[in-house]
């Protein structure tokens, strides 16, 4: 952003988000926005962090501080916060009626209930296919639409905890190169909720199962993870996320993988993505 995308049109809203409030790239982005004479808006879960001295307007998005470095609540809370922000902004701009605002907020409330049900569904899938999941070596996760974002978060969580290669792709992107490196040792997840994406995801999952039996298809209409129905297809992919978060924790615990390679400590000492005031919670 600071080097390539910091041209800020007058009608464009720019905000900087950092759950910890100590990420150096986010702090630099706030400084860049302020240097251009614009209001530097920072959104964080820790209003006492370094964000407070770099932001002109500091917003606490309400998830609180997590007790571990491999955060999980923050991403879900942030998605909900941004949805509510968008709805309120649309209402204030006259683009969403009072009734429309109430209806959309009700959808979010229904989604929150569905999220609670998705957690035990994820635990059940982990138990039923524990042998395959505990033997994961290389992981590919492909998703379309909002599910692509979930795929990226899921890959990050598996990689930073289990310390295995995990890549995220857009559903169609997976067909343009990534499929060529598949072997029976791969574990594959295909995420889709929109009806059009669902058909394509099912097709890819069936094809991938010809290479590896460790193939999973997540959707709101059947599939390997029986999540409850969501009131909006844009919200459904977030119901897939608890499975990956729970799996990352449970398998890292069971396989004793919390500690990293000894040389990772040297890397962290040489360069950091956090400011000097940050207290690391990650296990090295």
Segments (PLM) and residue ranges:
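C-terminal non-catalytic interaction/assembly regions of soluble proteins
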Residues: 220, 249-250, 270
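Glycine-rich phosphate-binding loops that contact phosphosugars or nucleotide phosphates
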Residues: 1-100, 107, 144, 179, ...
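Internal helix-turn-beta structural module
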Residues: 229-259
